Amino acid sequence: MKQIRFSKHALGYTASRGFTVAEVEDAIRTCAWAATELGRLDCRKDFGYGREWNGKVYATKQVRPVFVDEAGEIVVITVYTYYF
């Protein structure tokens, strides 16, 4: 199993986008990967949420990491978070 490393950019958005490192690692390890632009990959995982985010209560939080699969590690470039 490859190590997952987070870029400074990705880590800088944990609070403002509302994701955790554990959620991103879980998504990468358990969900299907899809090719995106510039040779990158992404995946999506829904998590039960049921809390307030920016003044509204959402039932689900979806975490979508964008990453590259390098020879010795997986590098997370950025993470998008969707609430619905």
PLM ranges: what are they?
Residues 1-84:
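Ribonuclease/tRNase effector modules and their secretory precursors
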